[in-house]
UniProtKB/Swiss-Prot annotation:
Annotated consequence of substituting R1400K: Reduced methylation by PRMT1 (in vitro). Strongly reduced methylation. Strongly reduced methylation
Organism: Homo sapiens (Human)
Lineage of producing organism: Eukaryota, Metazoa, Chordata, Craniata, Vertebrata
Residues spanning the membrane: none
Region (Interaction with dimethylated histone H4): 1495-1523
Protein's UniProt name: TP53-binding protein 1
Pfam families: 53-BP1_Tudor, BRCT_3
Phosphothreonine PTM positions: T302, T543, T548, T670, T855, T922, T1056, T1214, T1372, T1609, T1638, T1648
Motif (GAR): 1396-1403
Effect in UniProt of substituting R1396A: No detectable effect on methylation by PRMT1 (in vitro). Loss of methylation
Effect of Y1502 to L/Q: Abolishes recruitment to double strand breaks
Start-end of Polar residues biased regions: 94-121, 151-168, 195-205, 300-322, 346-361, 426-441, 481-490, 520-531, 849-864, 890-902, 1018-1028, 1188-1200
Effect after changing Y1523A: Increases affinity for histone H4 that has been dimethylated at 'Lys-20'. No effect on recruitment to double strand breaks
UniProt effect for mutating K1563R: Does not affect monoubiquitination by MSL2
């Protein structure tokens, strides 16, 4: 089982299973741990699936795994390896059995892994650590002495399981517990018999062993008892037994539960021990000690035997231990197969199914119980229990299990303590329930199967349903079983020592099972049970329970913050009593559980350590369990769990949380935020929650493994994943597992488990690489994210990984100064933790916390958030922290405690902290993310993500390396870089616009890392390396900074304390943390732990962090953006910037990887992830970030993802300092030697008569150097905009002066556009473009600052927009596409120091891409924000600053590229200074630029060049096809070439235009070619053959538009379009249809040539030039006959066509003034027609004559109407268009169904019913045809009239001899297959083809009459529509086939009548009919 993945890979091909092997932070097995971590990752992925099949067993297994992990970790290499060996030797029979059942063993592993996933993952991790804590000693003693048999079997089983993972998976897993394996396999049968015999009395035996004391004694003292317990366990493993036991516990009192738990405990103990042994072996194997694995399988066997619950044992062993110990062999193997299958942690069926064959006995009881359990488990409670159990245990193992845990194992009891917390978590099931409620589906038992999918194997679904159904005893039993099983597993692990807690846990599980489960108390549940049953560990257990309970209540009760608060508030209360109460209450009722939780929390305070642990466990359980349940479930569950935890905090942030989705609602946060919230909540809940977070972290690792197994795409689950990093070993295993699974699941995980991805990514990679390294990475994460949470666990993990022994020792020493203290403190919470633990799990924990800024940061953030969210909580937390002597440290400490007790550690990185470790654990997930481009196509700084296994390593390397490298690079001192990592990698989620989505898969998430300061530290370097590509620093960075800022501002004391702590913790935990944070330390100090914390608590911390980082420098909002900026600008170069960067990077990774591990690679993958990241941040940085979040959940994320770090919500935030702060924040920022140029432009436009007063103020380094005021007047164009541009010329990098600016513009332009929001946008862009380009291009000093602002002053005109558009255009394609990549470049290259214009307020999200470059780097995120801010023009200025980033990028990337192409850039530089002037003649800078401009007639955009600036915002364009015309700036897109991933319309050889996506560019002999992908096929098209439809062009308009973007509403809306048109206003570029060559064509030519061209129907097919063809008909652009201008001029050129009147094509260009008198005024209400899209057509003279002649035929009413119409002044299409545009109506040049559908209402305006193409198309499509009188009347009344009163008749019916009224019609040609035969291509074939297709025809075949050589299969057609030119051969054939042959009149009559009519009803229907 090479941990690296050779065997693991093969065995864990799916690697979805037991990554959850508890990873102890065993210094000894650091490398092993690392590998184990990877295994765990894999196992984690698999675990969810495995877990499903066996809930209760899972618990048992988990318990044991925890023990195992704990022992393995704690004793890991020293004691536990011995144990392993001993067990192996001691239990050779079992070993042989297992060996005999090698395949079975494997199966067990695989199958159980799913079980494990839920149980093992959650339970294993939690239980194992808990067990390790409780039973660490016991296990050592007991397992060595008692578990020889069971242990041997279990271990072996697991080992065997590895081999036969696919087959025996579930059964063996269950058997894995010691009995199950045997029960399942013949080899196990020996044990099985024992076990079975015990099984029968197992539960009862346990019950009989019920004396908690006895059980505990058994476990702790009585080896025989333990063996008995083990036997009981073996028997008990029968899931039914646990269920029963659980039930009994519930029904009975805690003692029975205890007793029962105790049996489980022994089982767990053995399993745990074996798991540990396995872990050790695995670690060794990871280290290369595969030999040990062989023996360990025996131990695994024993453990499995021990954990009678196959699930339990296998979970523990297979998942937790085996995977780790055996290199994930059995676990890994199991995870792959089982994981996928056993998605639901609680899904009993999976396990049972697999298990039933192998361990029928075991399964028999178990299935029933488990069946019900699965529901519980699926609900994440079980899963959470299991998961949390596991993570917690893992944490315990990692931290407490590592060194402290070793000691604890030696001590024995301490380990158990952690389990008790697990029990509480179980008890807190409600948390899971609550989260599950979020993902309600999780609850239903049915859900369980759903999680079956590897991705959904996160048990999230199960817990709530089952838990909530706990009322039924049977169900309760089952539910409880699942929950209890999970709990019990945990309990068993820890309950061996303390059965009472287990009982409690059961009790909780039972009644408050849903609460508990809901609460995600999986881990804690067992612990709680342990607590309940074992008051000895009451302190720790109680605390844990308390925490769990708080978590539970929080999570459960709508994520009740209050509960959390109360938990936090009640920390002082007796946790133990609480626990019992909790137990009973949980039993009794959910609410009670919550109360209990509160009480527990209260008690928690007393035993902070325990609480922390409990909370950790809770979180872990929560995370683990929830994360484990299933991707979706997991997301939900995780979301639930974390969210519930977060809920307290996130409740307030929930919007952000919810942004990701319902599940994602929490999921977004859940992965990161959830953890952040967990962190926060833990903070809020004081230590308990912190511990929980740590646990979560710890569990996260497991979960991560599990999650990746499940590939729970849900980032939320990832949160658990975050916990994954809980133990280095686990991480290693997880890492590896993730690696293996990464490819398959990474993307998925990333996308679905974005959090998980991060967790696994960040930690596993390093972990996989080196135990120490991952730990260091974790540490980094910790550091960078201030993931003290993670730090303790992750630090142990990371440090252990990196410096496995050294770090671990250091960490453990620092973390838990008393080696055992780590776990022990939890146990000894009351004693040791009482004061330190109050705040920090224990002094060590505190130290660890201190040592781990991440914990501190988390704490700080948490505190900040707490203080913001719940001051009371915070106070409680603070009080505890103060007890520790560090108020802020309290949270930090809590995290630290968690860290100290692994659980807390993992928990802390909820958002950021966990992320680093998670990254380690998650990399595979990220890899999966990459594999499945999901949301962030661009791996966030995780170039390795794509590689599954390597991705883990690499991701770890990259992410973690970013985290880790800086840390490593800096040498442990660089650990300080961890915070840097936080800063380093910023996952920014940009608004997802079509462009963004199209342009870069990862565009959504930008992993930004501060370009400037990022590299200052080693961490920075790492961050940059990671973020550089994507510059996602901003999201996390922003979050971190914001958080820091928040903390600094909102929670200075905590922040300061945190800082102090940070400073302190280097002292206390300084060894590790100092090493880790040395570099980071300063950063932290400088940033205030906030920075590191901020990643952890990104939500609050973003601002807080920013504040901390740039708190003094800028406001909170600014802080967020400034995180990067500050890093870059503020020159927080090394320290602050690094932390910021690290934070950012971590957060970005975190975003991707659930934010749990900021370091986790950028998990840009998912919006959810990003959202989660932000949410997580929100959670952590509730106040600041929350605001930010609220404003721009996605945006902020995006922005942050962009590396803008704009906490968009706060406004343009730091980048532009909100524009206002821009000066101060921008001005001071030029430390990079960039001259800070800032340009503030205020443009006021008066509608109608536009009088534009443009004031340009240029600042250089804050000094006003120039002020210009220009006044412009334009014809009615409605736009108003104010824009400020901060330009740092240097920032742009001086691409080419103007060019750079433009490039800047492109990014900035987009930003500006956005900022400007509509009309203003363009000007803004101009200013922003140039100015902003300049401003944003802080680096771009090229050109005068003013020059830089080559904002064409005429912002209305393209001039203004021009610069920005130009920039946009030149840089845009690159920018947009490279947004992410460019982002990194720009940010990295351009010293994002300059504030990025965040103001793109006006830009719609789609502009995101546009801002794309700008926003992408930082602006993208901002752009995202912009869209949100879009309406505010003020934001605009912010946008400018932000733009610089983009500009920077653009400059670097496309900017220079494009700009160089276009002269516009230089002009811009020149024009910049005279922006105002530029505005008037923006053309100056754009002349000669290659652009894509809109042909006014048909609305299509064609490539061409600007030949000169005509003024008034218009430019003369020479199109490539030879046409020339004046085009408004807004209709000019400065995007040549068209950006990649942009949807375009390409002219195929068949002369049909069809949509495609640009996938590449190439130049040959000066000619540009586009690689267009259509329907999966790519083809090269010439530049001229690629055009943009109106819709496609509008998407780019915001970003690349030369003129102000005027769409007020989303671009997709007709209203927006109309606004744009409005801007054009006078110019009337549409000049309607020039008279088309054919009347038909003319009337409809302008619209679309044919149906095929529908996308770009404007051009008639007739026009040969590809684009022209689209617009051939009536478009100005169409051929000369149409004469663009002439056509426009022609008022009503009449075409010859009978059906189509040329008028349609011709625009009546009457003098508006003259017309106004007749037509009515322009609407005073500028939004009169907003939302309406209009098609205008005009009756031809023939139509008028015909209608008049037929009036008599029609009803008098009709004639009267007709007369009325005649009385009305002549219809002037042009003037009517101007009226409609003036009222914000959108004019469709040609019929376009898509555009019509996007409008609120689409109307055809005509003077009368006519037979034009547009009219027919509207009849065919059901678009109402309205008289132009409606427009006239509406304008007169200045309010919309009811158009139904102005409906035009459909036409004259030949059959009825009258004019028929228009009526809504269904497709008249539904499913009709038509053959068109004619010699007129455009006016007949294409025209009628389009009309028929619009009318619903199934297919229309065009056949040219002259094409005699073509054979036509007439048999497939229903009708032939032709004209006299129809060849005789066709007629003959049709006649033979009895095919009706009709003329186009038949088609027309069908349209008029509204239904298909007879083919021979009228003579005119004959194709050869000759009109009279």
């Amino acid at each position: 089982m090479d941990p690296t993945g050779s065997q693991l890979d093969s065995d864990f091909s799916q690697q979805d299973t037991p990554c959850l092997i508890i990873e102890d932070s065993q210094p000894e097995s650091q490398v092993l741990e690392d590998d184990s971590g990877s295994h765990f990752s894999m196992l984690s992925r698999h675990l969810p699936n495995l877990q499903t099949h066996k809930e209760n067993p899972v618990l048992d297994v988990v318990s044991n795994p925890e023990q195992t992990a704990g022992e393995e970790r704690g004793d890991g290499n020293s004691g536990f390896n011995e144990h392993l060996k001993e067990n192996k030797v001691a239990d050779p029979v079992d070993s042989s059995n297992l060996d005999t059942c090698g395949s079975i063993s494997q199966v067990i592993e695989q199958l159980p892994q799913p079980n494990r996933t839920s149980s093992v993952l959650g339970m294993s991790v939690e239980s194992a650590p808990a067990v390790e804590e409780e039973k660490g000693e016991e296990l050592e003693q007991k397992e060595k002495e008692k578990e020889e048999d069971t242990s041997g079997n279990t271990t072996h089983s697991l080992g065997a399981e590895d081999t036969a993972s696919s087959q025996l998976g579930f059964g063996v897993l269950e058997l894995s517990q010691s009995q199950d394996v045997e029960e399942n396999t013949v080899p196990y049968e020996v044990d099985k018999e024992q076990l079975q015999s015990v099984t029968t009395n197992s539960g009862y035996t346990r019950l009989s062993d019920v004396d908690a004391n006895t059980a505990i004694k058994h476990e702790e003292q009585s080896n025989e008892d333990i063996p008995i317990a083990e036997q009981s366990s073996k028997d008990i493993p029968v899931t039914a037994q646990p269920s029963k036991d659980v039930h009994v516990v519930k029904e009975q009192n805690p003692p029975p539960a205890r007793s029962e738990d105790m049996p489980f405990s022994p089982k767990a103990s053995v399993a745990a021990m074996e798991a540990k042994e396995q872990l050790s072996a695995q670690e060794l194997m990871e280290s290369g000690l595969q030999i040990q694995k062989s023996p360990e399988p025996e131990v695994l066997s024993t453990q499995e035997d021990l954990f009678d619950q196959s699930n339990k044992t296998v979970s523990s062993d297979g998942c937790s231990t085996p995977s780790r110990e055996e290199g994930g062999c059995s676990l890994a193997s199991t995870p792959a197969t089982t994981l996928h299958l056993l998605q639901l942690s609680g899904q009993r069926s999976l396990v049972q199914d697999s298990l039933s064959t192998n361990s029928s006995d075991l399964v028999a009881p178990s299935p029933d119980a488990f069946r019900s359990t699965p529901f519980i488990v699926p609900s994440s409670p079980t899963e959470q229990e299991g998961r949390q159990d596991k993570p917690m245990d893992t944490s315990v193992l990692s931290e407490e299990g590592g060194e402290p845990f070793q000691k604890k194992l030696q001590s024995g009891e301490p380990v158990e303590l952690e389990n008790p917390p697990l029990l509480p978590e179980s008890t807190v099931s409600p948390q899971a329930s609550t989260p599950i409620s979020q993902s309600t589906p999780v609850f239903p038992p049915g859900s369980l199967p759903i999680p079956s999918q590897p991705q959904f194997s996160h048990d999230i679904f199960i817990p709530s349903p089952s838990l909530e159904e706990q009322s039924n005893d049977g169900k309760k039993d089952g539910d409880m079983h699942s929950s209890s099983l999970t709990v019990e597993c945990s309990k068993t692990s820890e309950i061996e020592p303390k059965n009472s807690p287990e009982d409690l846990g059961l009790s909780l599980t039972g009644d408050s099972c849903k609460l508990m489960l809901s609460t995600s108390e999986y881990s804690q549940s067992p612990k709680m049970e342990s607590l309940s049953s074992h008051r000895i560990d009451e302190d720790g257990e109680n605390t844990q329970i308390e925490d769990t309970e708080p978590m539970s209540p929080v999570l459960n009760s709508k994520f009740v913050p209050a509960e959390n608060d109360s938990i936090l508030m009640n920390p002082a209360q007796d946790g133990e009593v609480q626990l019992s109460q909790n137990d009973d209450k949980t039993k009794g009722d959910d609410t009670d559980t919550r109360d209990d939780i509160s009480i527990l929390a209260t008690g928690c305070k007393g035993r902070e350590e325990t609480v922390a642990e409990d909370v950790c466990i809770d979180l872990t359980c929560d995370s683990g369990s929830q994360a484990v349940p299933s991707p979706a479930t997991r997301s939900e569950a995780l979301s639930s769990v974390l969210d519930q935890e977060e809920a307290m905090e996130i409740k307030e942030h929930h919007p952000e949380e919810g942004s990701s989705g319902s599940e994602v609602e929490e999921i977004p946060e859940t992965p990161c935020e959830s953890q952040g919230e967990e962190l926060k909540e833990e903070n809020m809940e004081s230590v308990p929650l912190h511990l929980s977070l740590t646990e979560t972290q710890s569990q996260g690792l497991c979960l991560q493994k599990e999650m990746p197994k499940k590939e729970c795409s849900e980032a939320m689950e990832v949160e658990t994943s975050v916990i994954s990093i809980d133990s280095p070993q686990k991480l290693a295993i997880l890492d590896q597992e993730l690696e293996h699974k990464e490819q398959e699941a990474w993307e998925e995980a990333t996308s679905e488990d974005s959090s998980v991805v991060i967790v696994d990514v960040k930690e596993p990679s390093p972990r996989v690489d080196v135990s120490c390294e991952p730990l260091e990475g974790v540490e980094k994460c910790s550091d960078s994210q201030s993931w003290e949470d993670i730090a303790p666990e992750i630090e142990p993990c990371a440090e252990n990984r990196l410096d496995t022994k050294e770090e671990k020792s250091v960490e453990y020493e620092g973390d838990l100064k008393s080696g055992t203290a780590e776990t022990e403190p939890v146990e000894q919470d009351s004693s040791q933790p009482s004061l330190p633990l109050v705040r920090a799990d224990d002094p060590l924990r505190l130290d660890q916390e201190l040592q781990q800024p991440q914990t501190q940061e988390k704490t700080s953030n948490s505190l900040t958030e707490d203080s913001k969210m719940a001051n009371a909580k915070q106070l409680s937390s603070d009080a505890e922290a103060q007890k520790l002597g560090k108020p802020s440290a309290h949270a930090s400490q809590s995290f630290c405690e968690s860290s100290s007790e692994t659980p807390f550690h993992f928990t802390l990185p909820k958002e950021g902290d966990i992320i680093p470790p998670l990254t380690g654990a998650t990399p595979p997930l990220i890899g999966h993310l990459k594999l499945e481009p999901k949301r962030h196509s661009t791996p966030i700084g995780i170039s390795n993500y794509p590689e599954s296994t390597i991705a883990t390593s690499d991701v770890m390397s990259e992410s973690m390396v970013e985290t880790h490298d800086p840390i490593l690079g800096s040498g442990k001192g660089d650990s300080g870089a961890a915070p840097d990592v936080d800063d380093k990698l910023c996952l920014r989620m940009k608004l997802v616009s079509p462009e963004t989505e199209a342009s870069e898969e990862s565009l959504q998430f930008n992993l930004e890392k501060p370009a400037t300061g990022e590299r200052k530290n080693g961490s920075t370097a790492v961050a940059e390396s990671v973020a550089s590509p994507q510059k996602t620093m901003s999201v996390l960075s922003c979050i971190c900074e914001a958080r820091q800022e928040n903390e600094a501002r909102s929670e200075d004391p905590p922040t300061t304390p945190i800082r102090g702590n940070l400073l302190h913790f280097p002292s206390s935990q300084g060894e590790e943390e100092k090493e880790k944070l040395e570099g980071d330390h300063t950063i932290r100090q400088s940033q205030q732990p906030m920075k590191p914390i901020s990643p952890v608590k990104d939500p609050v911390s973003p601002a807080s962090q920013k504040m901390v980082i740039q708190g003094p420098s800028s406001p909170q909002g600014e802080a967020m953006v400034t995180d990067v900026l500050e890093d870059q600008k503020e020159g927080r170069s090394t320290n602050k910037e690094n932390p910021s960067k690290a934070l950012i990077e971590r957060p970005s990774q975190n975003n991707i990887g659930i934010q749990t591990m900021e370091c986790s690679l950028r998990v840009p993958e998912t919006v959810s992830a990003a959202t989660q990241t932000i949410k997580n941040v929100c959670e952590q940085g509730t106040s600041t970030v929350d605001q930010n979040f609220g404003k721009q959940d996605a945006t902020v994320q995006t922005e942050r993802g962009s590396g803008e770090k704009p906490v968009s919500a706060p406004g343009d935030d730091t980048e532009s300092l909100h524009s206002q702060g821009e000066e101060e924040f921008d001005m001071p920022q030029p430390p990079h030697g960039h001259v800070l140029h800032r340009h503030m432009r205020t443009i006021r436009e008066v509608r109608t008569l536009v009088t534009r007063v443009i004031t340009d103020v240029y600042y250089v380094d804050g000094t006003e150097v120039e002020r210009k005021v220009t006044e412009e007047t334009e014809e009615p164009i409605v736009e108003c905009q104010e824009c400020e541009t901060e330009v740092s010329p240097s920032q742009t990098g001086g691409s080419s002066g103007d060019l750079g600016d433009i490039s800047s513009f492109s990014s900035k332009a987009s930003s500006l556009h956005r900022t400007s929001s509509g009309t203003s946008l363009s000007a803004m862009h101009s200013s922003g473009s140039s100015g902003k380009g300049a401003g944003p291009l802080r680096g771009k000093t090229s050109g005068t600052e003013p020059a830089d602002f080559a904002l064409p002053s005429s912002r209305g005109g393209p001039g203004k927009l021009s610069p920005r558009k130009g920039v946009s255009q030149t840089g845009t394609p690159v920018c947009e596409e490279d947004g992410d990549a460019g982002l990194g470049i720009r940010q990295g290259g351009k010293a994002p120091v300059t504030p990025r214009g965040r103001g793109r307020r006006g830009r719609p999200p789609s502009r995101t891409t546009g801002t794309r470059e700008t926003a992408v780097p930082g602006p993208l995120g901002i752009e995202d924000i912009s869209p949100n801010l879009s309406p505010d023009d003020k934001s605009f200025s912010r946008v400018v600053p932000r733009v610089p980033d983009s500009t920077r990028r653009t400059d670097v990337g496309a900017g220079a590229l494009r700009r160089s192409d276009s002269p516009e850039i230089p002009f811009q530089a020149a024009a910049g200074p005279s922006d105002g002037l530029d505005a008037s003649s923006p053309g100056n800078s754009f002349v000669g630029l290659r652009v894509v401009a809109k042909w006014s007639s048909n609305g299509y955009f064609y490539s061409g060049k600007i030949t000169r600036d005509v003024g008034a915002g218009k430019y003369k364009l020479l199109f490539d096809d030879g046409y020339e015309c004046d085009v408004l700036g807004k209709d000019i897109l400065l995007c040549d070439p068209i950006p990649l991933d942009t949807e375009v319309t390409a002219l195929s050889e068949d002369e049909y235009f069809s949509a495609g996506v640009v996938k590449g560019h190439r130049k040959e002999s000066g000619e540009l070619y586009y690689s267009i992908e259509k329907e999966g096929q790519r083809k090269w098209y010439k530049r001229m053959a690629v055009i943009l439809s109106l819709e496609q062009g509008n998407r780019l308009r915001e970003q690349y538009g030369l003129g102000p973007y005027e769409a007020v509403t989303p671009l997709t809306k007709a209203a927006d379009i109309s606004l744009d048109n409005l801007v054009e206003g006078k110019r009337k570029r549409r000049s309607n249809v020039s008279s088309p060559a054919t009347p038909t064509a003319s009337s409809s030519s302008s619209t679309t040539p044919t149906r095929k061209i529908t996308e770009s129907p404007r051009a008639s097919m007739g026009v040969l030039s590809g684009k022209r063809k689209l617009i051939t008909s009536e478009e100005e652009r169409s051929p000369a006959k149409r004469g663009r201008k002439s056509a426009t001029v022609k008022p009503g050129a009449v075409g010859a066509g009978e059906f189509v009147s040329p008028c349609e094509s011709g625009d009546n260009t009457g003098e508006p003034s003259a017309l106004e008198e007749q037509r009515g005024p322009l609407p005073l209400n500028k939004t009169l027609f907003l939302g309406y899209a209009f098609l205008l057509t005009m009756a031809t003279t023939s139509d008028k004559l015909a209608s008049r002649s037929k009036l008599p035929d029609g009803p008098t009413g009709s004639s009267e109407e007709e007369e009325e119409f005649l009385e009305i002044p002549p219809f002037n299409k042009q003037y009517t268009e101007s009226q409609l545009r003036a009222g914000a109506g959108y004019i469709l040049e040609d019929f376009n169904e898509a555009q019509c559908n996007t409008a609120y209402q689409c109307l055809l305006i005509a003077d009368q019913h006519c037979r034009t193409r547009k009219y027919f198309l509207c009849l065919a499509s059901g678009i109402p045809c309205v008289s132009h009188v409606w427009v006239h009347d509406s304008c007169h009344a200045n309010q919309l009239q009811n158009y139904r009163n102005y409906l035009l008749p459909a036409g004259y019916s030949l059959e009825e001899q009258r004019i028929l009224d228009w009526q809504p019609r269904e497709n008249p040609f539904q499913n009709l297959k038509v053959l068109l035969v004619s010699d007129q291509q455009q006016n007949f074939l294409e025209l009628w083809s389009e009309i028929l297709m619009t009318g619903g025809a199934a297919s229309v075949k065009q056949h040219h009459s002259s094409a005699h050589n073509k054979d036509i299969a007439l048999g497939v057609f229903d009708v032939v529509v032709t004209d006299p030119s129809c060849p005789a051969s066709v007629l003959k054939c049709a006649e033979a086939l009895q095919l009706p042959v009709v003329s186009q009149e038949w088609v027309i009559q069908c349209l008029i009548v509204g239904e298909r009519i007879g083919f021979k009803q009228h003579p005119k229907y004959k194709h050869d009919y000759v009109s009279h």
